[in-house]
């Protein structure tokens, strides 16, 4: 539990993921939670079968993107730390996204004005926060400049969300 709390503190830009050494069981639980929470969120947005396919594609793209980056910068030994840090923080953001969808449903059912605008604004806030978190993790673990880590985080977001979404639209 203490390791989870340390990883979650990365969402508030504290700690360094290089200091954490997750066990294989912890990493697998992180991946399973990532998949289940993704299936729930995508299942609420779209057809459940499409959601499962899209989340599976996102996971594949995430693992491949992290691996490619670490091979490129010759830091393969950081793979477990990097993917665990990103996935834990992404799980946190995904949990907040699920709560946002519940809030949106409640606002629609109670006929609240601007329900759609509010949920879209929260969505943009969560995406911005997610990119900032990934940028922080990359900067801490790979000791890169702020501008490089922001570009890498944005690229990671496009690769893990944009490409699977594009594939699903084809």
Question: Can you annotate each of these PLM segments?
Answer:
Residues 49-108, 121:
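Alpha-helical transmembrane segments with an aromatic anchor "belt"
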Residues 92-100, 117-136, 158:
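Hydrophobic alpha-helical membrane segments
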Residues 16-22, 73-83, 139-148:
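Membrane-interface helix-boundary motifs at transmembrane edges
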Residues 38-44, 50-51, 104-127:
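Short alpha-helical packing/oligomerization segments
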Residues 110-114, 133-148:
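Membrane-helix boundary connector in multi-pass membrane proteins
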Residues 161-170:
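Juxtamembrane boundary at the C-terminal end of a transmembrane helix
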Residues 85-86, 148-159:
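Central hydrophobic cores of alpha-helical transmembrane segments
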Residues 1-45:
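N-terminal juxtamembrane cytosolic/stromal segments of multi-pass membrane proteins
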């Amino acid at each position: 539990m203490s390791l989870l709390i340390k990883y979650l503190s990365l969402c508030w830009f504290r700690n360094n993921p290089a200091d954490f050494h997750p066990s294989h069981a912890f990493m697998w639980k992180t991946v399973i939670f990532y998949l289940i929470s993704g299936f729930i969120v995508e299942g609420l947005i779209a057809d459940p079968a499409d959601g499962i396919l899209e989340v599976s594609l996102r996971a594949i793209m995430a693992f491949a993107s992290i691996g490619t980056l670490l091979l490129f910068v010759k830091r393969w030994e950081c793979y477990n730390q990097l993917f665990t840090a990103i996935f834990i923080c992404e799980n946190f953001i995904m949990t907040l996204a699920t709560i946002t969808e519940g809030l949106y449903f409640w606002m629609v059912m109670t006929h609240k004005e601007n329900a759609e605008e509010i949920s879209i604004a929260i969505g943009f806030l969560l995406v911005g926060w997610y990119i900032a978190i990934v940028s922080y993790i990359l900067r801490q673990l790979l000791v890169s400049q702020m501008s490089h880590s922001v570009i890498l985080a944005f690229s990671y977001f496009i690769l893990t969300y944009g490409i699977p979404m594009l594939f699903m639209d084809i």
